[in-house]
Amino acid sequence: MPPRKTRKSKTLAPALAFALLLTLALAACGGTSGGGSSGSQSPSSSDTPVQGGTMSLSYLTEPSSLDPAVAWNIIDWQIEHAIYQGMLQYAPKPGDAGAVLIPCLATEVPSVQNGGMSADGLTYTFTLRKGVTFQPPVNREVTAQDFKYSFERMMSSPRAPATSFYMGVVGADAFMKKKAAEISGFQAVDDYTVEITLKSPDLSFLNAFTMEFCDVVAREWVEKWGKQFNRHPLGTGPFIFEKWTPGQEIVLTRNPSYWEPGKPYLDKIDYQLSFSPPTALLKLQSGEIDALGDGVPPADIPRVMADPQWKALVYSQPLVAISYMFMNVQMKPFDDVKVRQALSWAINRDKLVKLQAGQAMSLWQFYPKGMPGHEDGKVFYGYDPAKARQLLADAGYPDGFETMLYTDNVDPNPKLWQSVQADLAAVGVKADLKTMSNNTYYNQQGTPNTLTAGSFGWWMDFPDPSDWIGPLFSKASAVPGGMNSSFWWSPALEAMFTEAQAMTDPEARIAKFSAMQQLISEEAPYVPCYQPIQTTMCSENTGGFFLHPVYQIDPTQYWKK
């Protein structure tokens, strides 16, 4: 899967997104203590957690950045989660239980019942924990002013990719247009109180505010490092950044002043970089590493599952995610809706699933299974080469056309997109396939008039369809550096999205998001191809291992036996 951050999940019930927003959680940030058998979504050991030891994880690519204001790749967020924290986080549990919001640096999740949310849904009040400090060498207490600085820094960054999530905060628009010196709707009332005011109710706001973009940073540390801050991260989390050796490793060490008693369990996390998934699997089986950040290679899954020793260490779950083919509407011939519709009929999704040894599910709509708004059984575009050829003829291309097709070099993408290339050739479209490194590809996708068509992956940030519409289909994201790789947007969709975001009736809101799918399907800026399944492994020396529905692999909760 290409370019972004990751989200793992057992399929979440459609009503879950709204249950999350009403949760009044009493627990603080904390870990699971084990229980359950290996190879399931229960933690990997019933042993009592122990302190000490180093955990090594493998990844093919290194982060694009470790600055929470701008980072949005898979590995970026997994490493940042160990370093930085925000007001809230998701419960450290597998499955649906892990999609529940709990307090982190705030003392509770705001709700109407506890007085943290106004009855009209417009104002949220967060009370900070006292005594939480930034990591060494800053070593000072975190205050509400730090959260205001961090939020405004993120919203003012020219490279911030997710500002569209927070445009509902009063004053955000004026601040971004440099018509105001601050965001008036984000106030530090006193040292321990933050008050956020929205222009209209937004049932997804707490989930959006829990993303890494809103984690707190220390102003003096950011100013000390300037543009190099992304290589010198510092937050309040359980692990401290030690070093980043490009192309080799990133090392984090235990935060001795971490605020949560007894955490973390590990002394060190060693992220080993640049290992291909097959090489990483061999290193895990020889005891050199402890977990596969990129998962078990699909070609090796049958062999691994046939061996009882390794099968017991395998963890698998569907992702609330989609792999698409984007088509850049700024570039010919993809500015023609009939061409986009034609290619939507041309791709054989079932073949893509077979090429991944069943580690995916065919998909014919724009929300993944498990995301509110997904409609079971709904097919917008199936596999019909004859219909594709007819639409191409209707568009003035009876003999097809030549174009470029792009993907990254991460297995299994080159093989999958060779299959797509063959499908397009079968309807007369001669696509020259070009692969490039993940980070290069990610950066070029956000550059206007650069990539004509190619692979694009989107993974759940939080369980609400606004996490799909805002980044992928909105005007705000169809900008340089944005996530809307097709650069398509529609005034009609913008109006529907604005209306849905202000709705307080969960059922009516989801119905509105379902209607958006129909409009998107008619314009076909992306071709939904498949929904991936994640399969990974840990070593037999790893305790507490499970796959989190949001954070995926989460060493902040594991220990070494």
Regions found by a protein language model. Name each.
Residues 536-561:
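Long beta-strand-rich cores associated with HINT superfamily self-processing modules
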Residues 239, 328, 334, 345, ...:
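Structural transition elements
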Residues 48, 353, 412, 426-441, ...:
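Extracytoplasmic/peripheral linker and loop segments enriched in polar/acidic and small residues
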Residues 246, 360-362, 372, 389, ...:
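Ligand/substrate-recognition segments at binding pockets and active sites
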